């Protein structure tokens, strides 16, 4: 992923409230547009980098269950 894109996404949401971040995520998912996927990936990268090992395990379990449901 281009480093400029990563920085642009982070700069675009830096300082946003939890409500604004949630709106950004929900809007990106509901739009269904593939052009939103890199931005969601950057946000997930930030989450992952700041998550505890317990949080990571929970996310992986949730992901695994979600993929089984598809």
UniProtKB/Swiss-Prot annotation:
Q: Where in the cell is it found?
A: Spore core
What Pfam families does UniProt report for this protein, alphabetically?
SSPI (PF14098)
InterPro entries given in the database record: SspI
User: This protein is called what?
Assistant: Small, acid-soluble spore protein I
Q: Which family does it belong to?
A: Belongs to the SspI family.
Q: Which organism is it from?
A: Bacillus licheniformis (strain ATCC 14580 / DSM 13 / JCM 2505 / CCUG 7422 / NBRC 12200 / NCIMB 9375 / NCTC 10341 / NRRL NRS-1264 / Gibson 46)
Recite the UniProt keywords alphabetically.
Answer: Sporulation
What gene does the UniProt entry assign to this protein?
A: sspI
Tell me if Membrane is a UniProt keyword of this record.
Answer: no
Q: Which GO terms describe its biological process?
A: asexual sporulation; sporulation resulting in formation of a cellular spore
